[in-house]
Design a protein with these regions (language model features):
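Sec-dependent N-terminal signal peptides
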Residues: 4-13
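Extracytoplasmic small-molecule ligand-binding "clamshell" domains
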Residues: 21-97, 105
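Short helices/loops that flank or line small-molecule/ion binding pockets
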Residues: 66-67, 75-76, 80-92, 106-108, ...
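Short beta-strand-to-loop elements that line the ligand-binding cleft
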Residues: 71-78, 145, 162-170
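Flexible hinge/capping segments at coil-to-helix
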Residues: 124-141
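Secondary-structure junction motif
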Residues: 143-159
């Protein structure tokens, strides 16, 4: 199962020293800056009616700021820049970041507070054509991914024979499936369960989630 982690700036200095310095900086400024993509339902979404961020990650960060006695400011970012925004000092922390060896070289991670599996989504009308993960691993199949996400790397691992199509945010990979420009995409089981409700023409390939 994938782990949702709070990503904290520790840079390349000794972790304990740099973490303490960052904490003191946040407490001194009275502000916790949080990078969020606002495109991952139900963790972080931007409500068009209020122009405010909502979701589980948002609730966690608001409670963290409250416990620290500081205000929280949400900074918009993209998946491809979610780590560089921390190392450049644009914001202090980010959420819903999958831990990878590359990311761990430049940033620190807390313990996970949520776990999920990875599942494929296809058009419901194509479920008989694509009943399994392996049925999507075909040179005639196009798999859409969102640039900079962990799913982009996982798609290369899971579907080495398929054609991969990386989409720049704010566009999303599932939109390529809806439009027919891609046969499938992979996402967290959490988001997948929300997407099939919002877009009933989508369906989850049911032969099991992967890590």
């Amino acid at each position: 199962m994938k782990k949702i982690l709070l990503l904290v700036l520790l840079a390349l200095l000794p972790f304990s020293v740099n973490a303490e310095s960052k904490l003191n900086q946040i407490l001194s400024s009275g502000e916790l800056k949080v990078g969020t993509t606002g495109d991952w339902d139900p963790m972080s979404m931007k409500d068009p009616a209020t122009n405010k961020y909502v979701g589980f990650d948002i609730d966690v960060m608001e409670e963290l700021a409250k416990d620290m006695g500081v205000k929280v400011t949400f900074i918009p970012t993209e998946w491809k820049t979610i780590v560089s925004g921390i190392t450049s000092g644009r914001y202090d922390v980010s959420t819903s970041v999958t831990k990878t060896a590359k990311r761990a070289l430049v940033a620190g991670f807390t313990n996970s507070y949520y776990k999920y599996g990875t599942v494929p989504l296809v058009l419901k009308k194509n479920l008989k054509k694509f009943p399994t993960w392996e049925s999507l691993n075909n040179e005639k199949v196009t798999i859409a991914t969102t640039l900079g996400t962990s799913q982009e790397e996982k798609a290369k691992e899971f579907f080495p024979k398929s054609k991969l199509k990386s989409i720049e945010s704010p566009a999303r990979d599932f939109q390529e499936v809806l439009s027919g420009r891609a046969d499938g995409h992979i996402t967290s089981s959490t988001e997948a369960n929300k997407l099939v409700i919002t877009y009933p023409q989508l369906a989850i390939v049911k032969d099991g989630g992967k890590n």
